[in-house]
């Protein structure tokens, strides 16, 4: 899971935080946002490990067979968007170095990344394994160099643009709430729920904090709000393109995998052709997404927390039913593939669907507080109120 959080885009978010916040504000934003992400993903990790189900299977129980199309679409759509962001993050600085239009690089990079996700090239797994220590080493070198050359962290962070801390918290949460929402896809194979929660929480607290710190120190020192340009300004252009490019490639593979699963749940079609469609759409939208990066993060921060909130809330509200399904799988009465196709699975669980819509609306429109927390609280309130209404109607 630690490698999962070593994400180049998080370093670019860190660069934006470094330019916008002073040192105290940066620490506060990363601490609060990191705690929200760790709690959110830790709860999802627990549910995934206890049930052995991925996001789409859990969604069919909590949202219903057709209601699950809503979370599947939102998570798949946002992961497809992250794929596009990753393509653009690599293509734009590469094109500037080569002094060419970025579109050829976008199309080539997007095509190669889509092909590797489609064919499941084993070499990409090796690249993923190697890129984690390499990105840690490159980020540490960049951060230490910037700190020494800038005369210390306090001086580096002195010239800020006055970003509100709560905006910074939103960027932190938005940077990984989409990937974090897919946590059960990875922890469903965990040996125990305890180990799944511990590794997930440590990964998000440690991994994300490191990524934000690498980007923030370099961003504050150079005045650049994109990690590629930060490292180019530090004379690290070639290492940045190789190491960060490899990291983007591997994370984009994971993004298309999650996208394919979500679209497959909606269409009941094989996953692989849908991976190609998602890769094409993500590639075509890459430059637009990059140009609207902060708005994209704000959208994710407000709209995605309600999905994971419902998955966790439904599990704890119906723990015995979930446990019965797990026991049925363990005893061979049903197969693991049939866990979400039982007769008890509803067509649409309206309390869940309405709760997500209400939570997203509150997170997007309420101007005070922390958007993700506002969305979570509203989702829980509407979800349990809706369950109460449905229970009285029976």
What are these regions (language model features)?
Residues 1-46, 50:
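N-terminal signal-anchor module of multipass membrane proteins
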Residues 32, 69-76, 97-119, 133-143, ...:
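Transmembrane alpha-helical segments of multi-pass small-molecule transport proteins
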Residues 16-17, 45-46, 89-97, 110-131, ...:
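Membrane-water interface regions at transmembrane-helix termini and the short interhelical loops
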């Amino acid at each position: 899971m630690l490698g999962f959080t070593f994400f180049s885009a998080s370093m670019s978010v860190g660069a934006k935080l470094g330019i916008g916040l002073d040192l105290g504000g940066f620490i506060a934003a990363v601490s609060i946002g990191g705690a929200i992400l760790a709690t959110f993903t830790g709860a999802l990790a627990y549910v995934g490990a206890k049930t052995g189900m991925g996001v789409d299977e859990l969604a069919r129980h909590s949202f219903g067979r057709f209601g699950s199309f809503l979370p599947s679409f939102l998570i798949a759509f946002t992961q497809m968007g992250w794929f596009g962001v990753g393509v653009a993050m690599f293509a734009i600085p590469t094109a500037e170095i080569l002094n060419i239009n970025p579109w050829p690089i976008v199309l080539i990079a997007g095509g190669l990344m889509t092909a590797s996700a489609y064919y499941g090239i084993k070499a990409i797994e090796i690249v993923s394994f190697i890129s984690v220590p390499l990105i840690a080493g490159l980020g540490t070198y960049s951060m230490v160099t910037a700190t020494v050359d800038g005369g210390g962290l306090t001086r580096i962070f002195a010239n800020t643009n006055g970003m509100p801390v709560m905006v910074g918290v939103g960027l932190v949460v938005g940077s990984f709430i989409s990937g974090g929402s897919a946590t059960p896809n990875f922890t469903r194979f965990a040996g125990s729920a305890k180990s799944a929660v511990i590794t997930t929480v440590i990964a998000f607290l440690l991994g994300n904090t490191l990524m934000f710190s690498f980007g923030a120190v370099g961003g504050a020192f150079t005045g650049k709000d994109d990690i590629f340009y930060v490292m180019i300004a530090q004379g690290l252009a070639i290492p940045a393109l190789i190491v960060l490019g490899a990291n983007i490639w591997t994370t984009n593979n994971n993004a298309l995998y999650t996208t394919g699963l979500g679209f497959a749940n909606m269409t009941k079609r094989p996953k692989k052709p849908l991976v190609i469609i998602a890769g094409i759409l993500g590639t075509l939208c890459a430059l637009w997404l990059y140009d609207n990066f902060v708005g994209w993060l704000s959208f994710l921060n407000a709209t995605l927390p309600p999905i994971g909130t419902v998955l966790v809330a439904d599990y704890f509200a119906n723990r015995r039913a979930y446990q019965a399904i797990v026991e049925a799988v363990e005893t061979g009465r049903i197969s693991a593939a049939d866990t979400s196709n039982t007769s008890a699975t509803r067509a649409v669980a309206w309390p869940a669907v309405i709760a997500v819509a209400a939570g997203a609306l509150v997170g997007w429109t309420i101007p005070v507080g922390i958007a993700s927390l506002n969305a979570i609280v509203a989702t829980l309130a509407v979800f349990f109120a809706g369950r109460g209404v449905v229970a009285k109607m029976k």
